[in-house]
């Protein structure tokens, strides 16, 4: 059995091409746990999670990537945020009834794929592409073609392992500033495309690579753990409250007796009463009653 929730990087010794392989289960489950999504939406989030993990692994700096789908369909928003430490979180917004077998275009409608790269130091970059492909992988390949001009292929699979949702994916990309032959890249892509969901989700990474590339020389590097981690905090909520007009905050307190701020990503609730608000306005740190 593979060790799920790990990202593996690998390199072809005889080609200027690098690869990534990721499988997720527990991380995906934690993203889905706090919501009652239709099956088709769960599948989209699973694919987004895999894609975001693969994309963050391409970062050459400390920072994060947000990959989101937005459109005028019943799935108005699906977003996964991850950083270079492979810490992931995600959420979707759904309206109306959605069939379990709805495809991407039916779910999102007329929409866009938005990729936001935020370095810890430096300027933020955002790329937007229309949802012209039939799959998320095809849309992401279009993004790479337009933004980085690096030949890139993604292969994403979803399924279940031991009765729990799981997903996996592989990325192939020509190395920057290298003269990879197009036929070499196409050859490796054809091999990778043969990977089956069951193989990717149930076999160890080295077995997957052997099945796909046993005639090639491949170096597999040490894995990186993938985990769910939400960045919400009481301090961040307090900072958000501080930006609201006093009259609006006071009105909510008068009606409700306290302010309940809910994190869509992890389900945490942060409660603020009148004394907390007074402390926020005086730049003090409020006490920390957090409700899960």
UniProtKB/Swiss-Prot annotation:
<dbReference type="GO" id="GO:0005737">
    <property type="term" value="C:cytoplasm"/>
</dbReference>
<feature type="disulfide bond" description="Redox-active">
    <location>
        <begin position="263"/>
        <end position="266"/>
    </location>
</feature>
<keyword id="KW-0676">Redox-active center</keyword>
<keyword id="KW-0963">Cytoplasm</keyword>
<feature type="disulfide bond" description="Redox-active">
    <location>
        <begin position="230"/>
        <end position="232"/>
    </location>
</feature>
<dbReference type="GO" id="GO:0042026">
    <property type="term" value="P:protein refolding"/>
</dbReference>
<keyword id="KW-0862">Zinc</keyword>
<keyword id="KW-1015">Disulfide bond</keyword>
<dbReference type="InterPro" id="IPR016154">
    <property type="entry name" value="Heat_shock_Hsp33_C"/>
</dbReference>
<dbReference type="Pfam" id="PF01430">
    <property type="entry name" value="HSP33"/>
</dbReference>
<dbReference type="InterPro" id="IPR000397">
    <property type="entry name" value="Heat_shock_Hsp33"/>
</dbReference>
<dbReference type="InterPro" id="IPR016153">
    <property type="entry name" value="Heat_shock_Hsp33_N"/>
</dbReference>
<dbReference type="InterPro" id="IPR023212">
    <property type="entry name" value="Hsp33_helix_hairpin_bin_dom_sf"/>
</dbReference>
<protein>
    <recommendedName>
        <fullName>33 kDa chaperonin</fullName>
    </recommendedName>
</protein>
<dbReference type="GO" id="GO:0051082">
    <property type="term" value="F:unfolded protein binding"/>
</dbReference>
<keyword id="KW-0143">Chaperone</keyword>
<comment type="function">
    <text>Redox regulated molecular chaperone. Protects both thermally unfolding and oxidatively damaged proteins from irreversible aggregation. Plays an important role in the bacterial defense system toward oxidative stress.</text>
</comment>
<dbReference type="GO" id="GO:0044183">
    <property type="term" value="F:protein folding chaperone"/>
</dbReference>
<comment type="similarity">
    <text>Belongs to the HSP33 family.</text>
</comment>
């Amino acid at each position: 059995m593979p060790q799920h929730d790990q990202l593996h990087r690998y390199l072809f010794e005889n080609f200027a091409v690098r690869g990534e392989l990721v499988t997720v289960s527990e991380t995906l489950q934690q993203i889905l746990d706090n919501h009652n999504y239709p099956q088709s939406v769960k599948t989209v989030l699973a694919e987004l999670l895999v894609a975001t993990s693969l994309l963050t692994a391409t970062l050459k700096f400390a920072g994060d990537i947000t990959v989101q789908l937005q459109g005028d369909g019943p799935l108005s928003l699906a977003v996964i945020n991850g950083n270079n430490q492979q810490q992931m979180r995600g959420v979707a917004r759904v309206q109306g009834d959605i069939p379990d077998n709805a495809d991407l275009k039916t779910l999102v409608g007329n929409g866009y794929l938005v990729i936001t790269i935020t370095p810890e130091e430096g300027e933020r970059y955002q790329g937007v592409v229309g949802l012209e492909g039939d799959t998320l992988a095809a849309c992401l390949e279009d993004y790479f073609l337009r933004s980085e001009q690096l030949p890139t292929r993604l292969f994403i699979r979803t399924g279940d392992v031991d009765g729990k949702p799981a997903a996996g994916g592989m990325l192939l990309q020509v190395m920057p500033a290298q003269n990879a032959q197009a036929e070499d890249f196409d050859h490796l892509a054809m091999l990778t495309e043969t990977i089956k969901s069951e193989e990717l989700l149930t076999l160890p990474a080295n077995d997957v690579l052997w099945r796909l590339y046993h005639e090639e020389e491949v170096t597999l590097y040490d894995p990186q753990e993938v985990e769910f981690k939400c960045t919400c905090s009481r301090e961040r909520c307090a900072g958000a409250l501080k930006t609201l007009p006093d009259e609006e905050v006071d009105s909510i307190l008068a009606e409700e007796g306290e302010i309940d701020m809910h994190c869509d990503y992890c389900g945490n609730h942060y409660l603020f009463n009148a004394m907390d608000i007074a402390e926020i306005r005086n730049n003090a740190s409020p006490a920390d009653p957090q409700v899960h």
